């Protein structure tokens, strides 16, 4: 399979494995965001991530700080020099992020599973040239995952990357999401030029599993890691 891709270009970031993206799963307060960003910047991390719109399985939970969080990400960018990344699920999210100067966007697993939603995002991104990362769908459907890349690529986006965050399962004895490594391996075989990131935090669901999952991803030739880190709960591997 051929997509019209080009390498992810973020000036100042070395082209070597692993490219690390880190930050809180959810931006909850400005203080939390800034404390975490400062800590990560001091450790040499160049790309800061934080979710500001959070799709939840059930209503009633915290669904993200919303547009207000974009100002916090802009402050991170201004005060630390880090690139900033967040998740988008609708065209409105895309417009707000582009207006705020967000550097990297990713599409979450629940959104990837909906071709209508992916197409809406693709249409909103036409004429834009920024890195777009796409998480695997919640179910282990490689064709659905590839279809999302095709939709975004057809809109003219060439700096694409995959995020492997595991797959939903009733079996949670070890992992929150089953890794099923053969699926991203097959993705690599089908689209060899597509960089693949591992999300060990969502796969493992436990702090103690993050480092070994990172190592396994590196052993399998993954290109980067996207790790959930907060100021009070550091999960970033030290190696």
Question: Can you annotate each of these PLM segments?
Answer:
Residues 23, 48, 97, 199, ...:
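Conserved, mostly hydrophobic/aromatic
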Residues 30-39, 89-94, 210-214:
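Short, acidic/polar
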Residues 125, 129-226:
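Catalytic alpha/beta core domains of metabolic enzymes, predominantly
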């Amino acid at each position: 399979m051929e997509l019209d891709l080009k390498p992810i270009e973020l000036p100042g970031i070395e082209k070597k494995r692993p490219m690390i993206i880190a930050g809180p799963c959810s931006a909850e307060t400005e203080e939390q965001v800034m404390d975490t960003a400062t800590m990560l910047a001091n450790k040499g991390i160049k790309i800061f991530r934080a979710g500001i719109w959070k799709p939840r399985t059930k209503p009633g939970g915290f669904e993200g700080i919303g547009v207000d969080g974009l100002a916090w990400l802009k402050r991170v960018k201004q005060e630390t020099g880090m690139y900033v990344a967040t998740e988008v699920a609708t065209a409105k999210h895309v417009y707000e992020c582009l207006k705020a100067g967000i550097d990297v966007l990713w599409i979450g697993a629940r959104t990837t599973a909906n071709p209508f939603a992916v197409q809406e995002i693709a249409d909103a991104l036409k004429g834009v040239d920024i890195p777009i990362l796409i998480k695997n769908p919640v179910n282990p459907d490689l064709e659905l995952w590839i279809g999302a890349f095709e939709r975004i690529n057809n809109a003219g986006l060439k700096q694409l990357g995959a995020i492997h965050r595991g797959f939903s399962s009733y079996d949670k004895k070890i992992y929150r999401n089953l890794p099923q490594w053969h699926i991203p391996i097959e993705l690599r075989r089908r689209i060899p030029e597509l960089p693949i990131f591992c999300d060990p935090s969502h796969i493992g669901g436990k702090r103690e599993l993050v480092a070994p999952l990172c190592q396994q991803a590196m052993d399998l030739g993954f290109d980067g890691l996207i790790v959930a880190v907060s100021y009070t709960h550091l999960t970033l591997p030290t190696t």
